[in-house]
Amino acid sequence: MAKEVFQRTKPHMNVGTIGHVDHGKTTLTAAISIYCSKVNKDAKALKYEDIDNAPEEKARGITINARHIEYETAGRHYAHVDCPGHADYIKNMITGAAQMDAAILLVAADSGAEPQTKEHLLLAQRMGIKKIIVFLNKLDLADPELVELVEVEVLELVEKYGFPGDTPIVKGSAFGAMSNPDDPEATKCIKELLETMDSYFDLPERDIDKPFLLAIEDVFSISGRGTVATGRIERGIIKVGQEVEIVGIRETRKTTVTGVEMFQKILEQGEAGDNVGLLLRGVDKKDVERGQVIAAIGTITPHKKFKASIYCLTKEEGGRHKPFFSGYRPQFFFRTTDVTGMVSLEGKEMVMPGDNVDIVVELISLIAMDKNVEFAVREGGRTVASGRILEILE
């Protein structure tokens, strides 16, 4: 069957659901998908099981890797990432957040904000997300007086992490909407959420004029066609027949893009902001991996050593309890990759939680990087600092 061509009739935006495990992120994603399929006859409804689609996820009922679905509202085309809330999988949440323009923060009305709610807000802020909408879920299970307290608490938290004080809150039950898609009362919260997304989220300015760059999120082998790398186009435009370079982790190599697709539809060209799959000529699946980037030839180089300015989270923000010294070896998260690096302090003996400081980092492998790129620093399963590259040293 020939694939259909993706029609660009509405502005495209990437959103995602973030929040604590079991607060209902995947249920909300499914409820949106089902609601949009009722309103728009072309849309495909995805059930909870379709979104949580890895065997381990079905067994545990939690999302491990970020999942993508698409839907349309009256005014926009959305790509929606369902981000994992489970602590072990927060690094996949970082990959998901790196692809979002805006986020929907889920908070269960019956339990309020929890540790991961804070960590996700911090990561969203570090990944450059400017606006969020709060979806207060499980309203049917919560004491009405408690709901008001949760609202106040959540808005305080949202402001603390640098999001606007007038962040909208939509209240409802994602499970109710998913289970009763034909009941207007049950789906009212989904309708309100989508309308709020259209009106409150600003369409991002896309770097279409800059050289092409995509950070690889996943790699697949399609029999008879070759190797496909997926990810979000960070900047520029890509067309079939274009020569590109695969940079980072391994030796830089050239290849040609022989196909561009989004959500199983053919794209005439991929643009900044699109989540795409690129078919690569003559590249074996084992030669490409998550964390590399695909870029216009000669526009980005791999490096190991750089100077950066970082902010170390306090104990209250979920960071370290003790200072660190030269020789500290945490993981550095760039775009879709995490790599161990060694920290050197210059003119400073130690770094305390809560400090803003400049450091020199030497990574154990070469990563495609440029100035001003932001990164997260993690250790032992938690985010301990966030930073930005000031200068590339080697």
From Swiss-Prot:
Gene3D superfamilies: P-loop containing nucleotide triphosphate hydrolases (3.40.50.300), Translation factors (2.40.30.10). SUPFAM superfamilies: EF-Tu/eEF-1alpha/eIF2-gamma C-terminal domain (SSF50465), P-loop containing nucleoside triphosphate hydrolases (SSF52540), Translation proteins (SSF50447). Residues 19-26 are annotated as: G1. PROSITE patterns: G_TR_1, G_TR_2. It comes from the Bacteria. One of its GO terms (molecular function) is GTPase activity. Its EC number is 3.6.5.3. The keyword GTP-binding applies. Belongs to the TRAFAC class translation factor GTPase superfamily. Classic translation factor GTPase family. EF-Tu/EF-1A subfamily. This is Elongation factor Tu.
